[in-house]
C-alpha cells in the first residue's frame, strides 16, 4: 500500500478506548475527506483519458447517449439532491458512502486488469487499495457516529455485468464509457457525503454542497 495511506493505523489507536478525543475524530474525518477527494480526482482523470483514447467517430456516437444511464450503483438508496442529503443523518451518509465504495470492489479489479498497460492507470497505482483504505476509515467513523440504522444488501459480491473488457465493438465501448462515468459520479457522491458529515461536527467555512 502506498506510503500516503499509512495514517489510519495511527489515528485508529484512539478508538481503542471509550473516550475519543475531538482532535483525533477531526483528523480521521479530515483524512477520509482528503482520500475521497483524491479518488474523485483519479476517477475524473481516468474518465478523461478514456475519452481521449476514443476515435472521433465513436466519440460522436457516444455523445448522443447519456453514459450515466443504468449505473450499477443505482440500487443503493443514495440521496437524490442537496436537500435530501442535508436531511439524512451523519450515520446514514457514512453507511451509504461505505456501500458505494464496496460496490466498486469487483469492477475496479476488472477495470485495472483491462487497462493495466494503459496510461489510464499510470497515475492511479493501487486504486483498489485506496478504496479499501478509505472504506476502513469510514467503518471506524461509523463506530463513533453510527450507521444510520439502515440495512443495505452486501454489494461486494455482486457483478457489474455491463463491463466489457475486450472492447470488441461499439456496444462494448459504450459499456466501458458508462462504467467510468458511473465511477466518477459515485466518487463525487462519497466526497460530498463525507464533507457534509465533517462540516456538521466541526463548523467550517466551506460547508456548501
From Swiss-Prot:
PROSITE patterns: SOMATOTROPIN_1, SOMATOTROPIN_2
Signal peptide boundaries: 1-19
Keywords assigned: Disulfide bond, Hormone, Metal-binding, Secreted, Signal, Zinc
Region of interest (Disordered), ranges: 59-87
Keyword Zinc among UniProt keywords: yes
GO cellular component entries: extracellular space
Gene3D superfamilies in alphabetical order: 1.20.1250.10
Pfam family, one: Hormone_1
Residues holding Zn(2+): 38, 191
InterPro entries, per database record: 4_helix_cytokine-like_core (IPR009079), Somatotropin (IPR034975), Somatotropin/Prolactin (IPR001400), Somatotropin_CS (IPR018116)
Gene Ontology terms: biological process: animal organ development; growth hormone receptor signaling pathway; positive regulation of growth; positive regulation of receptor signaling pathway via JAK-STAT; response to nutrient levels
Disulfide-bond pairs as recorded: 71-182, 199-207
GO MF annotation terms: growth hormone activity; growth hormone receptor binding; metal ion binding
Compartment(s) where it occurs, according to its Swiss-Prot or TrEMBL record: Secreted
Keyword Disulfide bond included in the entry's annotation: yes
Function: Growth hormone plays an important role in growth control and is involved in the regulation of several anabolic processes. Implicated as an osmoregulatory substance important for seawater adaptation.
Family listed: Belongs to the somatotropin/prolactin family.
Protein name: Somatotropin-1
Protein encoded by which gene: gh1
Amino acid at each position: 500500500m502506498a506510503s500516503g495511506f499509512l495514517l489510519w493505523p495511527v489515528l485508529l489507536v484512539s478508538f481503542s478506548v471509550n473516550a475519543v478525543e475531538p482532535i483525533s475524530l477531526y483528523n480521521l474525518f479530515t483524512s477520509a475527506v482528503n482520500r475521497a477527494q483524491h479518488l474523485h480526482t483519479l476517477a475524473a482523470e481516468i474518465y478523461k483519458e478514456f475519452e481521449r483514447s476514443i476515435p472521433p467517430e465513436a466519440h460522436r456516437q457516444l455523445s448522443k447517449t447519456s453514459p450515466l444511464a443504468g449505473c450499477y450503483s443505482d440500487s443503493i438508496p443514495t440521496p437524490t439532491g442537496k436537500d435530501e442529503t442535508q436531511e439524512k443523518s451523519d450515520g446514514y451518509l457514512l453507511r451509504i458512502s461505505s456501500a458505494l465504495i464496496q460496490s466498486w470492489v469487483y469492477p475496479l479489479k476488472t477495470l485495472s486488469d483491462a487497462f493495466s498497460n494503459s496510461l489510464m492507470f499510470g497515475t492511479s497505482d493501487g486504486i483498489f487499495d485506496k478504496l479499501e483504505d478509505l472504506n476502513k476509515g469510514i467503518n471506524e467513523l461509523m463506530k463513533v457516529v453510527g450507521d444510520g440504522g439502515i440495512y443495505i444488501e452486501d454489494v461486494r459480491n455482486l457483478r457489474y455485468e455491463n463491463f466489457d473488457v475486450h472492447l470488441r465493438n461499439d456496444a462494448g465501448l459504450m459499456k466501458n464509457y458508462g462504467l467510468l462515468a458511473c465511477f466518477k459520479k459515485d466518487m463525487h457522491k462519497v466526497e460530498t457525503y463525507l464533507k457534509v458529515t465533517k462540516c456538521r461536527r466541526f463548523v467550517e467555512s466551506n460547508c456548501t454542497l
